[in-house]
Design a protein with these regions (language model features):
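N-proximal low-complexity "stem/linker" segments adjacent to membrane-targeting elements
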Residues: 1-30
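Surface-exposed, flexible loop/turn segments at secondary-structure boundaries
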Residues: 12-14, 37, 96
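Acidic ATP/Mg2+-coordinating residue in the GHKL
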Residues: 32-36
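Active-site-proximal specificity loops/subdomain of glycosyltransferases
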Residues: 37-84, 99-113
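Catalytic metal- and UDP-sugar-binding loop of GT-A-like glycosyltransferases, i.e.
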Residues: 91
Length: 137
């Protein structure tokens, strides 16, 4: 079985989404805290990286990233790599997953897809989809 990890950052107590991700048996959750994250943050199954854990891991990197930003998740990516992750998914801590989340992955599979090429300097890939509700990240 593949070694699958879910990475997110948070400043909140565990949300409904976090509880659902934390209870997935075929994924392991890593939550990266920030200075605003409650100090008593706790997961049943997953790994919580406190600000202190991050600073102890690599103070220079912590200082370079800064606080109160999503880039703190890099510590989660490093931890997953250290734990020999085969697949890593990044999520938001407030987006509750559908029941089929993480199932039927296309990783390492051949799939048909549309390919777009342009000579323009900038290309908006969402403009060529049928998904007008998507937003740029």
């Amino acid at each position: 079985m593949q070694n699958r990890y879910i990475i997110t950052t948070t400043i909140n107590n565990p949300t409904d989404a976090i509880h659902k991700f934390d209870n997935m048996s075929d994924w392991k959750l890593i939550v990266v805290g920030d200075k605003k994250t409650p100090s008593n943050y706790n997961l049943r199954n997953g790994i919580y990286l406190s600000p202190e854990d991050q600073e102890n891991y690599d103070k220079d990197l912590s200082d370079a990233i800064g606080w109160n930003c999503i880039q703190r998740r890099n510590f989660g990516l490093l931890k997953a790599h250290q734990l020999d992750a085969d697949i890593i998914a990044t999520i938001d801590d407030d987006n509750i997953p559908f029941d089929n989340w993480g199932k039927n992955l296309l990783v390492s599979k051949n799939v048909d897809l549309d390919y777009y090429e342009t000579d323009e300097i900038v290309f908006d890939p969402i403009s060529v989809t049928n998904h007008n509700n998507l937003w740029h990240r």
